[in-house]
């Protein structure tokens, strides 16, 4: 997606309201494969850049007084003309159907995503206005951001909440075998977050072939791996070939 492109979305057919992105994400993911399935699961660094109309620094005054933010964004790679009342969550093996409003599937009537991220700083770019630096984002590079709201701990945190099937395997992690000669090809500042991503098992839940080689682009690199039982083995790290 062109980061300068502003996408209009018809949100309410009755009132005719139009919702426009105010910003977009710069992240290390140029493909959906490998992106954590929820925010906050890996210490991924990203930046929020505003479109020209919203680059007034006054709009982010006071933002640094918060530690976390809510991002409201668009599943820009999952827009469909039709919608289905049920979807098949990967966590359930890809065969069991659940109501779309009982999941966080990207295939929704309105392709809206919601992510809680950590705010690490705000800088001012003389040409492009304020840049918001975040950690823990689960967003594709170029994702349109519709709104940014502060996370309010006393209102937004619900430790007693139930999470249905989404929490059934939340503590499952793979052991990651990353040969030093391959790990050294990854910038040191990206190594920790990459290992966290791999430990989360990027594969679709229904693919368990131990001989298959998987790959995804990350931070300008192509990461290839295979999984055998509970261990992930990194096979190759090469420069990403841009299409």
List each language-model region with its residue ranges.
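Conserved positions in beta-strands of structured domains
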Residues: 117-120
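Mixed-charge, low-complexity intrinsically disordered regions
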Residues: 1-112, 124-133, 137-243
């Amino acid at each position: 997606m062109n980061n300068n492109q502003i996408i209009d979305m018809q949100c309410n057919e009755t009132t005719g309201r139009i919702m426009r992105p105010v910003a977009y994400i710069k992240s290390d993911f140029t493909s959906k494969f490998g992106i954590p399935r929820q925010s906050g699961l890996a210490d991924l660094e990203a930046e929020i850049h505003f479109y020209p109309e919203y680059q007034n620094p006054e709009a982010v005054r006071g933002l640094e007084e918060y530690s976390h933010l809510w991002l409201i964004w668009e599943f820009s790679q999952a827009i469909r003309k039709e919608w289905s009342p049920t979807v098949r969550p990967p966590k359930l093996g890809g065969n069991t159907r659940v109501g779309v409003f009982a999941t966080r599937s990207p295939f929704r009537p309105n392709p809206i995503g919601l992510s809680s991220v950590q705010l690490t700083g705000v800088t001012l770019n003389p040409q492009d206005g304020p840049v918001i630096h975040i950690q823990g984002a689960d967003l594709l590079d170029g994702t349109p951001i519709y709104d940014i709201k502060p996370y309010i701990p006393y209102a937004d945190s619900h430790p007693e909440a139930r999470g249905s099937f989404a929490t059934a395997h939340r503590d499952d992690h793979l052991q990651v075998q990353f040969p030093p000669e391959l790990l050294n090809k990854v910038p040191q500042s990206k190594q920790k977050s990459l290992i966290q991503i791999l430990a989360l098992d990027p594969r679709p839940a229904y693919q368990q072939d131990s001989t298959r080689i998987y790959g995804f682009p990350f931070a300008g690199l192509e990461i290839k791996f295979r999984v055998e039982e509970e261990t992930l083995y990194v096979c190759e790290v090469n420069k990403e070939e841009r299409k």
